[in-house]
Protein backbone atom coordinates (compact mmCIF):
# COMPACT_ATOMS: atom_id res chain seq x y z
CA UNK A 1 0.00 0.00 0.00
CA UNK A 2 1.34 3.40 -1.02
CA UNK A 3 0.65 6.80 0.44
CA UNK A 4 -1.14 9.22 -1.85
CA UNK A 5 1.33 11.26 -3.83
CA UNK A 6 1.28 13.80 -6.64
CA UNK A 7 2.94 12.57 -9.80
CA UNK A 8 2.47 15.66 -11.96
CA UNK A 9 1.24 15.95 -15.54
CA UNK A 10 1.54 12.97 -17.85
CA UNK A 11 3.17 13.82 -21.18
CA UNK A 12 0.83 13.61 -24.19
CA UNK A 13 0.92 10.15 -25.76
CA UNK A 14 1.99 8.40 -22.56
CA UNK A 15 -0.33 5.54 -21.57
CA UNK A 16 -2.16 6.03 -18.28
CA UNK A 17 -4.39 3.84 -16.17
CA UNK A 18 -4.68 1.66 -13.11
CA UNK A 19 -3.01 -1.68 -12.54
CA UNK A 20 -4.68 -4.21 -10.24
CA UNK A 21 -3.25 -7.57 -9.27
CA UNK A 22 -5.57 -9.99 -7.54
CA UNK A 23 -5.24 -13.49 -6.18
CA UNK A 24 -7.93 -14.90 -3.85
CA UNK A 25 -6.65 -15.98 -0.45
CA UNK A 26 -7.76 -19.15 1.28
CA UNK A 27 -7.59 -17.15 4.53
CA UNK A 28 -10.72 -15.27 3.46
CA UNK A 29 -12.43 -17.37 0.76
CA UNK A 30 -13.49 -21.01 0.78
CA UNK A 31 -13.40 -21.09 -3.03
CA UNK A 32 -10.11 -19.70 -4.38
CA UNK A 33 -10.28 -20.81 -8.01
CA UNK A 34 -10.78 -17.83 -10.31
CA UNK A 35 -13.59 -18.31 -12.83
CA UNK A 36 -11.81 -16.58 -15.69
CA UNK A 37 -14.74 -16.96 -18.13
CA UNK A 38 -16.93 -14.83 -15.82
CA UNK A 39 -14.21 -12.20 -15.54
CA UNK A 40 -13.84 -12.10 -19.34
CA UNK A 41 -17.61 -11.64 -19.76
CA UNK A 42 -17.58 -8.89 -17.14
CA UNK A 43 -14.72 -7.04 -18.86
CA UNK A 44 -16.48 -7.30 -22.24
CA UNK A 45 -19.62 -5.80 -20.68
CA UNK A 46 -17.82 -3.04 -18.78
CA UNK A 47 -15.96 -1.86 -21.88
CA UNK A 48 -19.25 -1.79 -23.84
CA UNK A 49 -20.88 0.27 -21.08
CA UNK A 50 -17.85 2.59 -20.95
CA UNK A 51 -16.77 3.07 -24.59
CA UNK A 52 -13.17 4.19 -24.89
CA UNK A 53 -12.11 2.24 -21.81
CA UNK A 54 -9.44 -0.39 -22.38
CA UNK A 55 -9.02 -3.32 -19.98
CA UNK A 56 -6.02 -5.61 -20.32
CA UNK A 57 -6.30 -9.01 -18.64
CA UNK A 58 -3.16 -10.99 -17.92
CA UNK A 59 -3.96 -14.55 -16.91
CA UNK A 60 -0.91 -16.73 -16.32
CA UNK A 61 0.96 -15.10 -19.19
CA UNK A 62 -2.00 -14.91 -21.58
CA UNK A 63 -2.83 -11.29 -22.41
CA UNK A 64 -6.36 -10.35 -23.56
CA UNK A 65 -7.36 -6.77 -24.36
CA UNK A 66 -10.97 -5.59 -24.05
CA UNK A 67 -12.14 -2.44 -25.82
CA UNK A 68 -15.50 -1.43 -27.23
CA UNK A 69 -15.64 0.96 -30.14
CA UNK A 70 -19.43 0.87 -30.47
CA UNK A 71 -20.56 0.82 -26.84
CA UNK A 72 -24.01 -0.63 -26.21
CA UNK A 73 -24.25 -1.64 -29.87
CA UNK A 74 -21.63 -4.29 -29.13
CA UNK A 75 -23.90 -5.74 -26.40
CA UNK A 76 -26.85 -5.71 -28.81
CA UNK A 77 -24.72 -7.46 -31.46
CA UNK A 78 -24.03 -10.22 -28.94
CA UNK A 79 -27.70 -10.46 -27.85
CA UNK A 80 -29.13 -10.75 -31.39
CA UNK A 81 -26.34 -12.65 -33.15
CA UNK A 82 -28.53 -15.75 -33.70
CA UNK A 83 -31.79 -13.84 -34.26
CA UNK A 84 -33.47 -12.49 -37.37
CA UNK A 85 -33.16 -8.70 -37.05
CA UNK A 86 -36.07 -6.96 -38.81
CA UNK A 87 -35.41 -3.27 -38.11
CA UNK A 88 -32.62 -0.74 -38.03
CA UNK A 89 -31.25 0.23 -34.65
CA UNK A 90 -32.27 3.26 -32.70
CA UNK A 91 -29.52 4.77 -30.55
CA UNK A 92 -30.37 7.27 -27.84
CA UNK A 93 -28.02 9.25 -25.62
CA UNK A 94 -29.38 11.73 -23.10
CA UNK A 95 -27.53 13.67 -20.42
CA UNK A 96 -28.68 16.28 -17.93
CA UNK A 97 -26.41 17.19 -15.04
CA UNK A 98 -25.29 13.97 -13.36
CA UNK A 99 -28.04 11.92 -15.04
CA UNK A 100 -27.31 10.03 -18.23
CA UNK A 101 -29.24 7.49 -20.28
CA UNK A 102 -27.73 5.47 -23.12
CA UNK A 103 -30.08 3.11 -24.96
CA UNK A 104 -30.05 0.93 -28.07
CA UNK A 105 -33.25 -0.59 -29.48
CA UNK A 106 -33.75 -3.02 -32.33
CA UNK A 107 -36.44 -5.50 -33.37
CA UNK A 108 -36.23 -9.20 -34.15
CA UNK A 109 -38.78 -11.69 -35.42
CA UNK A 110 -39.27 -12.99 -31.84
CA UNK A 111 -42.55 -12.27 -30.10
CA UNK A 112 -41.25 -11.31 -26.67
CA UNK A 113 -39.54 -8.24 -25.25
CA UNK A 114 -35.88 -8.69 -24.34
CA UNK A 115 -34.69 -5.99 -21.99
CA UNK A 116 -31.14 -5.78 -20.63
CA UNK A 117 -31.13 -2.99 -18.03
CA UNK A 118 -27.99 -1.56 -16.42
CA UNK A 119 -27.83 1.07 -13.71
CA UNK A 120 -24.45 2.68 -13.05
CA UNK A 121 -22.90 -0.16 -15.13
CA UNK A 122 -24.48 -2.87 -12.95
CA UNK A 123 -26.93 -5.37 -14.46
CA UNK A 124 -30.31 -5.12 -12.75
CA UNK A 125 -33.31 -7.45 -12.70
CA UNK A 126 -36.13 -5.41 -11.17
CA UNK A 127 -37.06 -1.88 -10.28
CA UNK A 128 -39.08 1.19 -11.16
CA UNK A 129 -36.58 2.17 -13.86
CA UNK A 130 -37.68 -0.78 -16.01
CA UNK A 131 -41.37 0.13 -15.75
CA UNK A 132 -40.59 3.78 -16.42
CA UNK A 133 -38.46 3.03 -19.49
CA UNK A 134 -41.33 0.94 -20.92
CA UNK A 135 -43.77 3.79 -20.20
CA UNK A 136 -41.47 6.38 -21.79
CA UNK A 137 -41.04 4.22 -24.91
CA UNK A 138 -44.79 3.67 -25.28
CA UNK A 139 -45.48 7.39 -24.92
CA UNK A 140 -42.73 8.42 -27.38
CA UNK A 141 -43.68 5.80 -29.99
CA UNK A 142 -47.31 6.95 -29.90
CA UNK A 143 -46.22 10.57 -30.21
CA UNK A 144 -43.99 9.70 -33.19
CA UNK A 145 -46.72 7.63 -34.90
CA UNK A 146 -49.21 10.49 -34.53
CA UNK A 147 -46.72 13.06 -35.86
CA UNK A 148 -46.14 10.85 -38.92
CA UNK A 149 -49.94 10.39 -39.26
CA UNK A 150 -49.54 6.61 -39.03
CA UNK A 151 -52.10 6.80 -36.22
CA UNK A 152 -55.15 8.88 -37.10
CA UNK A 153 -56.98 11.05 -34.60
CA UNK A 154 -59.73 8.43 -34.20
CA UNK A 155 -57.21 5.57 -33.69
CA UNK A 156 -56.43 4.34 -30.21
CA UNK A 157 -52.87 4.60 -28.95
CA UNK A 158 -50.62 1.60 -29.33
CA UNK A 159 -50.16 -0.40 -26.15
CA UNK A 160 -46.86 -1.37 -24.60
CA UNK A 161 -47.44 -4.92 -25.88
CA UNK A 162 -47.90 -3.63 -29.44
CA UNK A 163 -44.66 -1.68 -29.34
CA UNK A 164 -42.51 -4.12 -27.38
CA UNK A 165 -43.16 -7.30 -29.37
CA UNK A 166 -39.79 -8.51 -30.69
CA UNK A 167 -37.97 -5.52 -29.19
CA UNK A 168 -34.42 -5.83 -27.89
CA UNK A 169 -33.43 -3.00 -25.57
CA UNK A 170 -30.09 -2.50 -23.86
CA UNK A 171 -29.81 0.57 -21.66
CA UNK A 172 -27.55 2.01 -19.00
CA UNK A 173 -28.73 4.71 -16.63
CA UNK A 174 -26.08 6.68 -14.77
CA UNK A 175 -27.54 8.62 -11.86
CA UNK A 176 -26.73 9.59 -8.27
CA UNK A 177 -28.64 8.59 -5.13
CA UNK A 178 -29.91 5.22 -6.30
CA UNK A 179 -31.22 2.82 -3.65
CA UNK A 180 -31.01 -0.96 -3.98
CA UNK A 181 -32.65 -3.75 -2.00
CA UNK A 182 -29.35 -5.47 -1.15
CA UNK A 183 -25.60 -5.28 -1.63
CA UNK A 184 -25.86 -7.39 -4.81
CA UNK A 185 -27.70 -4.41 -6.42
CA UNK A 186 -29.90 -6.49 -8.72
CA UNK A 187 -33.12 -4.76 -7.64
CA UNK A 188 -33.40 -0.98 -7.72
CA UNK A 189 -35.83 0.37 -5.11
CA UNK A 190 -35.40 4.12 -5.71
CA UNK A 191 -34.25 6.05 -8.76
CA UNK A 192 -35.16 9.53 -9.99
CA UNK A 193 -36.25 9.18 -13.62
CA UNK A 194 -37.62 12.75 -13.83
CA UNK A 195 -34.83 14.00 -16.15
CA UNK A 196 -35.71 11.32 -18.71
Language-model segments: residues:
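Duplex nucleic acid-engaging cores and interfaces of nucleic-acid transaction enzymes
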Residues: 36, 46-47, 83, 130-136
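Structural beta-strand/beta-sheet cores of well-ordered domains, especially the beta-sheet scaffolds
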Residues: 16-20, 45, 51-55, 88-92, ...
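Short acidic, glycine-rich loop/turn motifs
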Residues: 57-61, 94-96, 107
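Short acidic (Asp/Glu) and glycine-rich catalytic loops that position anionic groups and cofactors
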Residues: 17-25, 50-58, 84-86, 110-120, ...
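GHKL/Bergerat-fold ATPase module
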Residues: 98-196
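Active-site phosphate-binding and catalytic loops of NTP-dependent enzymes
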Residues: 50-56, 77-94, 141-160
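GHKL-type ATPase core
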Residues: 1-79
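Intrinsically disordered, low-complexity regions
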Residues: 25, 69-72, 83, 87-89, ...
